[in-house]
Amino acid sequence: MGIVDEFQALKAETDADLLAMQVGDFYEFFAADARTVASVLDLQVSEKSNHGSSYPMAGVPVDDLTPYLAALVERGYRVAVAEQSETDAGDIEREIERVVTPGTLLASTDADPRYLAAVVREAGGDWGLAFVDVTTGQFRVTRGADRADAVTELYRFAPAEVLPGPALRGDDDFLGVLRERTDATLTLHDAGAFDAGRATHRVREQFGDGVIESLGVAADGPVVRAAGAAVGYIAAADEGVLASVSRIQPFGGGDHVELDATTQRNLELTETMTGGSDGSLLATIDHTASAAGGRRLAAWVTRPTRDRAELDRRQAAVGALADAALARDALGDVLGEIYDLERLASRAASGRADATDLLRVRDTLAALPDVADALTTTPELAESPARDVLARVDRAAAADVRAELADALADDPPKTLSEGGLLQAGYDEALDELLAAHDEHRAWLDGLADREKDRLGITHLQVDRNKTDGYYIQVGNSETDAVPDGEDGAYRRIKQLKNATRYTMAELDSHEREVLRIEAERAELERELFAALRERVGERAAVLQDVGRALAEVDALVSLAEHAAANQWVRPELVAGDGLDIDAGRHPVVEQTTSFVPNDARFDASRRFQVVTGPNMSGKSTYMRQVAVIVLLAQVGSFVPADAARIGLVDGIYTRVGALDELAGGRSTFMVEMEELSRILHAATSDSLVVLDEVGRGTATYDGISIAWAATEYLHNEVRATTLFATHYHELTALADHLDAVVNVHVAAEERDGAVTFLRTVRDGATDRSYGVHVAALAGVPEPVVDRARGVLDRLREENAVEAKGSAGESVQAVFDVDSGGFVDDAGDDGEADDPEAAAVLDELRTVELAETSPVELLGTVQAWQDRLED
């Protein structure tokens, strides 16, 4: 069987997108795979002949596979890797050892988490979700009540790969939303892996017999099915990767602030509405020095906690660090030099760590005492909970690992095991003996050239080595007459060059054989010693991951303190129950780029629902987002951008701010808006913060007003959530006279000599001006259009009819005709745009003969008219 035939046979065994097959010192790709890889990785394509046919071929050196593999997988490809081995008979065999996928890639160059997600929906409606980050060993599971819950968590975790359960594979709506809101690769894993029996066995096998009971979920429920499918998928792809995953943790709505996917987007927590990270809340407050610290801060921002004790602990730590500038600087310097210990530990546990990885483990553990010293010797941190972070790790075990690595590893190890020189002298007696013998032979070889020059009396002689000729003596052709050819010390010619001749001799051959034997034995022994060392480190991966998480937490706390100190943020007072009082609050992102006008926000039992009016572009949306972000930051454990803040803890933050058509899901702007509103009305509680902006604007005016009015009443009377409701429906301001906790506030503007100035100040009371035409002028709309708009606006204010009923009873939009001075329907027909039924009643009223109609008959007629009008 030819190489290409073998490649194609192996490719048929896997459903991976690409196959990398080891052929000697290279991993080769053939046929269509070669073209794909060459295009993605910018490799040269050559041709390989096979049975008279020619096939494209591209390859990478064995020692360089990892970065190329990562580049392919990070672009969404699943790559099978076939290794070669030699049998006892000397034959070469190849078989697929692993499949590397977007969710099982260990060697990721991206600092962000890299989750594999499995999602299960049961017939009863419950959802189960499992999220595994094999690069750090994290495995988290949760239950969802509906599709919105599932989408929220998938948006939050942003997995690299998703395994939808059998019931979801035909759910086009769910899959469409998943493709739209994440960049995940969708993989249809073996449906049997989601079976309750197989999944339960997998979970218990990986985490222990009692683990399911500790999770508090049903053994045959969707959570365990999702977890088991994820474990099975990883095992099928690469069994070794599972060694990094030793703990499984549940999470649920009760331990964190609910932030649905819409809210995360609207508040621009990790990316802006345009898709980039610059300008997001996280990018603004992230001053972390390490990749792990950045991941920890991102987790806090996207999953704020409801744990009051944890919030108090974080706030106290941030406050103390904010007052300790020298300690922050010292910690920043140390943390900036450490490596990603969580990921390094996972690679060690899976058997994938190389010498450089272990060297980085050693250096990171060596920094641990420096971090501890900065935390414990700084007076400002004497009572700080920041000190307690490192108390939660086994520093003695970590010190043992560091000491063993320091004794074992050379300071500058080679890139690959085959090069040798990984381990220090004195680490292993047998290795030291081999190295000493090797040095003796090398010393003889190093002195051979000078000895032969002296013996033969020539100058152009050198001793060297290459893969083809081994060790050789090279003599310039002008001096070859001096080369000995007798029995004693005779040279044997091995290659003729243009200007020189290469020779060997019996004594050189003997030393070469010994050098090669020693090098082979040394390489094999070093591989064994290194593998044993790596295994011992991997066995303590849990300790190392704990240390990595502790360092990440310190880094995140220092980052929050740095931002608080640099921007004059204050520690908010956290209280149970409702109530929100912010003095001179600011938006944390906007204040970085513009001169910001601070605003107060006051919410209590008598003003927990605030209707916000004001001109377009005046800052209503910024103000409302500002309030929401300040509340969120408080429950991250951060200080907040304000002069003072008293914040009642919330169980969720829900927003509906703007909407775009979701064409992939076939849903219009208004449908998206109503779905988001429905989610809020069902999910929010009296402990929630709700932010609504322009509800009802996606439909006809009267429909929109009606929906906004009814939603306001429901939120006020039934949900009783703290609410900000921005609107241009000025009719809603009348609700303040009818609902006891509704108040009106507005963003002020000043109009003088036809010019409008937006003051950005929030004041009590309502406004009935939107200044939309003024905004159009600011946006550069042509002056004739703006002038015409002003004229239409003036006439519209005189006649308030906007919508009418058509002749067939359907709703139609009425359009004001400035030239005629009246309204026409949307077909352009002149008319009063009144209800035809009402017009008929009016006609009958005009013809009633009052003098000839008895009071009883008149009463009956009026009753009939009323019935007709109500219908």
Curated annotation (Swiss-Prot):
Classification via Gene3D superfamilies: 1.10.1420.10, DNA repair protein MutS, domain I, MutS, connector domain, P-loop containing nucleotide triphosphate hydrolases
Which GO terms label this protein's molecular function in UniProt? ATP binding; ATP-dependent DNA damage sensor activity; damaged DNA binding; double-stranded DNA binding; mismatched DNA binding
One Pfam family of this chain:
MutS_IV
Coiled-coil residues are none
Please name the PROSITE patterns in this protein's record: DNA_MISMATCH_REPAIR_2
UniProt superkingdom: Archaea
* Keyword entries, A-Z: ATP-binding, DNA damage, DNA repair, DNA-binding, Nucleotide-binding
Matching InterPro entries, A to Z? DNA_mismatch_repair_MutS, DNA_mismatch_repair_MutS-lik_N, DNA_mismatch_repair_MutS/MSH, DNA_mismatch_repair_MutS_C, DNA_mismatch_repair_MutS_clamp, DNA_mismatch_repair_MutS_core, DNA_mismatch_repair_MutS_N, DNA_mismatch_repair_MutS_sf
**Signal peptide (from-to):** none
Keyword Ribosomal protein in the entry? The reply is no
Q: Provide a GO biological process annotation.
A: mismatch repair
Checking SMART domains in the record gives: MUTSac (SM00534), MUTSd (SM00533)
Q: Has keyword Cell membrane?
A: no
Q: Where does ATP bind?
A: 614-621
Q: Which family does it belong to?
A: Belongs to the DNA mismatch repair MutS family.
Q: What role does this protein play?
A: This protein is involved in the repair of mismatches in DNA. It is possible that it carries out the mismatch recognition step. This protein has a weak ATPase activity.
| NCBIfam families documented for this protein | mutS1, PRK05399.1
> Can you say what this protein is called?
DNA mismatch repair protein MutS 1
Q: Which organism is it from?
A: Halobacterium salinarum (strain ATCC 700922 / JCM 11081 / NRC-1)
Lineage, opening ranks: Archaea, Methanobacteriati, Methanobacteriota, Stenosarchaea group, Halobacteria
Quote the gene name from the UniProt entry.
mutS1
